Amino acid sequence: MARGMNHVYLIGALARDPELRYTGNGMAVFEATVAGEDRVIGNDGRERNLPWYHRVSILGKPAEWQAERNLKGGDAVVVEGTLEYRQWEAPEGGKRSAVNVKALRMEQLGTQPELIQDAGGGVRMSGAMNEVLVLGNVTRDPEIRYTPAGDAVLSLSIAVNENYQDRQGQRQEKVHYIDATLWRDLAENMKELRKGDPVMIMGRLVNEGWTDKDGNKRNSTRVEATRVEALARGAGNANSGYAAATPAAPRTQTASSAARPTSGGYQSQPSRAANTGSRSGGLDIDQGLDDFPPEEDDLPF
């Protein structure tokens, strides 16, 4: 399995006041919703502002230190973090999973940018930054499909490995399962990827909200790819073999991309606004908060 790479960079506003809470085992958890708008050029040449809301968490002592800084809703921050995959048993039965942002660092900006008032009572930052870079192995053979308008779309799921030491000093490995969506030429150019292939994906982090068959509101997080690099098999492997996975398939989206080859890979520009579950009418990230696990007690830090 390729040695994983997992980076998230956000610049946005705190949509509301952050919160500090404690798990049943006494672990501090600092939680904030960082919100902004991405400015993208569509396939038709028009500029669009795509709103996003991402839940960000800091754990342990750093959470308490962050809380002491007394950040409040409307403050602009820069976040450096990683995508964190969690899976747990749902109270109603069955397994549930979620991907959210684990912040490694959060700093307040020295200037106050333009804020957009949200009808739901929060704010988001105009001209924000939302960048993701992940490297891992494809977990299953992707299938290309086409929208009624003829746009190609490819859904990829990759396994990103993370090595760390637990509280007892033992070396551990954890795998994060990340879903990504590729559009148009980018999808066509990457349709030959196969299970186990190492791949690097760059893009923007988006949320998608939907209602399940039981009427419950759900939320998922994925990467909308802007550039993908297929890597040589065996390069940068931390060990031999492949970690199989069966994460839930991503939902259908409504965005597209125009792509061009760059340095052996392909880079794309998103066009029409994606169904991110973050409409400008409110703090829609709240719709799927039940998708997040209630405790972080099993985390190693």
From Swiss-Prot:
Region (Disordered): 238-301
Disruption phenotype: Essential, it cannot be knocked out. As SSB levels are depleted growth slows, tolerance to ionizing radiation and UV light decreases rapidly. Cannot be complemented by ddrB.
CC terms in the record's Gene Ontology section: cytoplasm; nucleoid
Gene Ontology biological process terms in this record: DNA recombination; DNA repair; DNA replication
Chain ranges of the SSB domain: 5-110, 129-232
Main location: cytoplasm
Record's subunit section: Homodimer. Binds ssDNA. Interacts with DdrB.
Annotated PANTHER family: SINGLE-STRANDED DNA-BINDING PROTEIN
Function: Plays an important role in DNA replication, recombination and repair. Binds to ssDNA and to an array of partner proteins to recruit them to their sites of action during DNA metabolism. Essential for ionizing radiation resistance. Stimulates the 5'-3' DNA helicase activity of RecD-like helicase. Stimulates RecA protein-promoted DNA three-strand exchange reactions in vitro with both D.radiodurans and E.coli-derived RecA. Complements an ssb deletion in E.coli, but does not complement a ddrb disruption in D.radiodurans.
Protein name: Single-stranded DNA-binding protein
Species of the source: Deinococcus radiodurans (strain ATCC 13939 / DSM 20539 / JCM 16871 / CCUG 27074 / LMG 4051 / NBRC 15346 / NCIMB 9279 / VKM B-1422 / R1)
